């Protein structure tokens, strides 16, 4: 009887130990499998871009970095797989939205220059943000950010300015596949001053002095729907019916 009790205790201890081991293995896997979200750690420097958006829209940010330096060990390659030149460009897509509700957005963007593990200087070149919904899956209200210059077209915009993609409305056009497709165009404003003559279906560019970026920098950008803003996509029947009628 005593032997059976000892065996039962040992079996129970083994089960408990196994459960604890599996718990920590699972926790470790969970931690390592989580996406690397920039800006969720206190030692990560970033600028913020935030504002309003249509509740059905989702946004994404693209950042592009120069990779340079005399000691840089990374190379760009040509179509034949041969080394073309030292350094190159890194592109990063950011999709994590820190906003707490669907009518706003908040993205955190790395901006500081640093030296990577290949002794290359990595420096922010430009970045952009654009919206998508089920009607316009290609993207709309795209805003690009580039370094300011001395020409009339790339003059510096104040970092505290409010940028607005206003009166964003849907339009239908014939695609290269001879089907009708949807797109959304917007009018762009900076501090209430209209910057685009017609609806912009491509992108608008803002020029900043990147050297002024710091951890407190917040870019204010609102995307506002117009009366003819559309969320629902064209159905297959609608596309073919319209094309048939046009022919």
From Swiss-Prot:
GO cellular component, one term: membrane
Keyword Transmembrane: yes
Subcellular location: Membrane
Deleted gene: phenotype: Deletion mutant is susceptible to killing by V52 strain in a TseL-dependent manner.
Claim: ATP-binding is one of the keywords in the record: no
Domain of life: Bacteria
Keywords from the UniProt entry: Membrane, Transmembrane, Transmembrane helix
Functional summary from the UniProt entry: Immunity protein that plays a role in preventing early activation of toxin TseL.
Protein name: Immunity protein TsiV1
Gene that this polypeptide is encoded by: tsiV1
